[in-house]
């Protein structure tokens, strides 16, 4: 890249893909929201972003919608959610307190199942295990062959597992549908009529500002109050191309803008 200099243009964008942690709500101790919340509080997402973005296709610290898009929560507001504050020492002290309160002993061991795809599952999985170790948890990673992994999630053959999604457009109806209680993709099997109602209301309203408020309420309940799932870091697209290529603009989704009908070459 350096050798080519101005002959190459690099476009970057947050990606409408991410890995998050699903926990079975019908298996102890993950049926206790204090434990789930502690697992999120343990994560230093900001240090993780700095380190992992150098070796993996993840970068932005985000909530339930792609950072920088219309329905995404601004950073200052996001930082109020459990696990998103910058004081990691305080966060981890709270995590340890919650685990103790929930009766989880120091050194508690569990298996984290991960999808057998190197990027970015492997580095993100290693990072998660290291973060949880720092609140006194002993986590073993079990890597499952990629072709078998979706079936494992559908069967519920896990206590804690890496989950994932990629959207074809940044839209709350699509990105949040899996968190409705009756969704086939609700692999943690949480039952939350509050989220169900909020999801239905945000889908029906035609008032953009009202919809943003409803999406924020879903986010707070999903990631903070109930900690049904744990978001890691947003994937990050980096697309280099020859500078003589014009008319192509990166999007948050790799499914879009590939027809190339507006692309032209200056030489």
Describe the residue ranges of each PLM region.
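Short, well-structured beta-strand/strand-turn elements
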Residues: 133-147
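Loop/turn elements at helix/coil->beta-strand transitions in domains of secreted/extracellular proteins
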Residues: 5-8, 32-36, 45-48, 106-109, ...
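Detector for C-terminal structural segments
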Residues: 11, 18-19, 42-76, 116, ...
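Short helix-loop capping/hinge motifs at secondary-structure junctions, enriched
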Residues: 26-35, 205
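Periplasmic solute-binding protein
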Residues: 14-27
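Immediate post-signal peptide segment of exported/extracytoplasmic ligand-binding proteins
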Residues: 33, 92-111
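Short, well-ordered beta-strand elements
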Residues: 107-117, 140
């Amino acid at each position: 890249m350096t050798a080519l200099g101005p002959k190459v243009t690099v476009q970057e964008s947050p990606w409408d893909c991410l890995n998050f942690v699903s926990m079975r709500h019908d298996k102890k101790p993950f049926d206790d929201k204090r434990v789930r919340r502690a697992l999120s509080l343990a994560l230093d997402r900001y240090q993780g972003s700095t380190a992992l973005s150098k070796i993996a296709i993840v970068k932005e610290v985000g909530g339930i919608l792609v950072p920088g898009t219309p329905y995404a929560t601004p950073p200052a507001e996001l930082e109020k959610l459990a696990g998103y504050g910058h004081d990691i020492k305080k966060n981890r002290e709270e995590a340890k307190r919650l685990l103790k309160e929930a009766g989880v002993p120091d050194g508690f061991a569990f298996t984290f199942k991960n999808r057998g795809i190197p990027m970015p599952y492997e580095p993100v999985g290693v990072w998660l295990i290291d973060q949880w170790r720092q609140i006194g948890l002993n986590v073993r990673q079990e890597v499952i062959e990629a072709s078998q992994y979706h079936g494992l999630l559908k069967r519920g053959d896990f206590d804690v597992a890496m989950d994932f999604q990629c959207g074809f457009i940044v839209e709350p109806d699509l990105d949040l549908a899996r968190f409705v209680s009756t969704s086939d993709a609700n692999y943690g099997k949480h039952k939350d009529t509050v989220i169900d109602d909020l999801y239905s209301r945000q889908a029906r309203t035609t008032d953009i500002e009202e919809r943003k408020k409803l999406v924020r309420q879903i986010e707070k309940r999903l990631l903070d109050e109930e900690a049904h799932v744990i978001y890691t870091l947003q994937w990050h697209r980096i697309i280099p191309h020859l500078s003589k290529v014009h008319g192509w603009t990166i999007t948050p989704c790799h499914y879009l803008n590939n027809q190339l009908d507006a692309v032209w070459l200056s030489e």
